[in-house]
Amino acid sequence: MIDFSKLEYPYPYIPVEKRYDILPEHSICSIAPAEESSDDFITGNGALRVQASGRPYTEEMAYTQELLYEPLWEKTPLPPDLRPYLPEIRRLLLEGKPEETDKLLDEAQKKAGFDKYMNFDNKILYPTGSPRLHTAFWLSFTQPEQSDTRDYLRWLDTQNGMITSIWTNARGAFRTDSFAAYDGDVIVNRLSAPEGQLDVDVSITPPGRPFKHGNMVFKNPFVKSTHELTIEGGMITLAWAYNPDFGHKGFVAAIRLLPEGGTMEKIEKGFSIKGATRLTVVSKIVKFESDFTFACKKAVQDELAAMQVDFDKLLQGNEKHIGERMDRSRIHLGKKEDEVLSGEELLRRTHSDKEIDPTLMDKLYDMGRFFQIYETGALPPMMGQHNINTNLQVCAGNNTGLFDEMDVYFRYCETKFDDFRTNAKLLFGARGLLASVHCDPDSGLYYHFSRTYPHYCWTGCLGWVYNELWGYYLVTGDKEFLRTRLIPAYKEMALFFEDYACDRGPDGKVIFYPSFSPEDPTPNPGYETVTCASINPTRINTVMDIAICREILTNLIDGCKTLGIEQENIPHWEKQLADLPTYLLDQEGGLKEWAWPTIEENYNHRHVSHHYDVWPGRAITPETEPELTEAIIISNRKRGQQDDSAHGIIHRALTAIRLKDMEEAMQNMSQLFNHGFVRRTLQASHFPYRGVFPDLTGAVPAFLVEMSVFSMPGIVEFLPAMPDYLMHGSIDGVWLYTVAKLEHMEWNEHGAKAVLTSGKAQTLTLRCRRKGARILVGGTELPMDGDAATYAFREGETVQVEILF
């Protein structure tokens, strides 16, 4: 038999029974330092981020600021003018010649000068990437190694964002704390030791380490960058000037060291502290978008030098900002006594049990919401693209009350409308808005071009983003938001689709072309994974874009009717809606990804873009579209995985949860939680056991909300997809897509009790699919119609709902 207590870790760790008096109530802990940066804890305040490995004697922390994107150019280039090529492109597509279509598009892009931005890897042509957030600097904290180190533990407090590591050796107990303060906009580190026992060298490493992703080595963006490093007066200052070819941009990082006791001496890249009891390090990073010179450092140095550093007060400010947001929504599936288990222990339990560990899910729920809080500053989460990555990273924000964070996501797109109009005009000769798929804090212009990834032919990008704005309207009922921010944008999106989908097929329906279904077919790891004959991605009638266009038009019409405006235009939009292409089924009755009869399906593909109407959309439910529900259950189950990237598995899981296909939902969730996508700090990976990528991090709260309660206008469904083994739990704070809020719900094998508040006067259908379920409101049993009952709410009314199984 295996003695699990004897599993080897770098240091003897604090046992479970001793953690109850150490760990904060809401925390995620680890029993070993990170061996690679992917297992660091990460925290931030929106603008600033810091990650820590927790290594006692060789700690190296990475610091950055949200605006430090590697510059690609001084001014974003205009997209190529494809208008002269469009008639020929469309003719070739209708004639079934996608390869010639791709060649023609490729020629047009290269003539416009975009070939210099493309990258070749394994004979696959990649477009230029989005600007990449880079590290401002690394700080190394080097202490004398001790052979008798024990009682190790590190954790992240999700109520205030503080990362802590503790250990003991012959010299006594040591501790390191790190957080990014909202007050003062600084990163704070504090190293504590027994009196007079802190000996530490603090040294800086500037940016410029090589970056490699798979077989691709990214070009060094700092070839022409220059910097100035000064170490004096207890302060390390890095002034960094970017390539002057890209404008006079740069940043200043000032790092102030405040030892308590002992001595401090200058060393080559920092300071050496001897015989101290405590060391506080305060760092400030400021980006300059123009007129940068090394002289800019003085103002930053002066500001930091004048700052009154009160560690506890700064931490209290974080508790107020983060803690209040975290307390808005919680889920409790696991046992209270298990909350002190480490990520390593929780993963070991879920790997050895037949079910996903409930406490692991509780902590992933917290981690997902904490991620959106600390990652949102002037910019929203920005890792990946807007074709599923960022969408997943924020997808639980509306339901769990992170409205300030969601507004940053909304405004990020709203500020780029002029660029979106340019995209629509030059790429398709259309009026209206065409959003860019890539994340760029400075520009919404399309520059993401290659034959392999024709994302500019994915016309639904902005519609998916606006699914979240519409979701905000559904949970709040904010009609001013509807009037001023939704309707004007939807009108321009509808205008784009009117011009883009202007030709008609043999059935009289409009044609979406050239069209791209993200990202089909994708060459990862190679085209040998593609199951259809053609590997050319530019095609006709992607179902995703048809679904998004339908959602745009439907929401536009409904919104205008609600406001009593634009009545003269509604018949035009209704005609546009009626002219959309009809979906097609394959031989098994599964929904096809392309609504064009001659296009073959590629089943081994990591995206399920054509399931948009189920999630994130709400057009298809078992009640509203039973036949399409069955078709999507089939297509969801048939999907291969291509390259094991998380986002496709996530979308399949969310599709299955919405359709109440429990076997498929749990199979996909099991793969995500058990097979290398969750790291021991409970951060997530894009590929199993490789790196950190937050798609799953942002999506887990959505999983658990949707399993607990489904909502759409006029409908609230309780426990729609909760597996039997999780039939003891509770959830607090879920904003519902019908201007209502689930204040609290708890459940067991006998039934559920919920507190529900309606933000408006409305009659709600209350549903529970459990066999024989009865529904009571305020102690009065309601008449059932199948699995549902109705109740007429007054505006602001809060009721007790009881469901008996």
Which residues does each predicted region cover?
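Aromatic-residue-lined binding/catalytic grooves and analogous aromatic/hydrophobic interfacial grooves
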Residues: 2-449, 453, 471-473, 491-494, ...
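C-terminal capping/lid segments that line or modulate ligand- or cofactor-binding pockets
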Residues: 37-68, 72, 119, 384, ...
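Extracytoplasmic/periplasmic, Sec-exported soluble proteins
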Residues: 81, 353-356, 360, 401, ...
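Short, glycine/acidic-rich hinge or "gate" loops at secondary-structure transitions
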Residues: 378-383, 482-484, 502-513, 565-572
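Extracellular/periplasmic, surface-exposed regions of secreted and cell-surface proteins
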Residues: 450, 457-463, 475
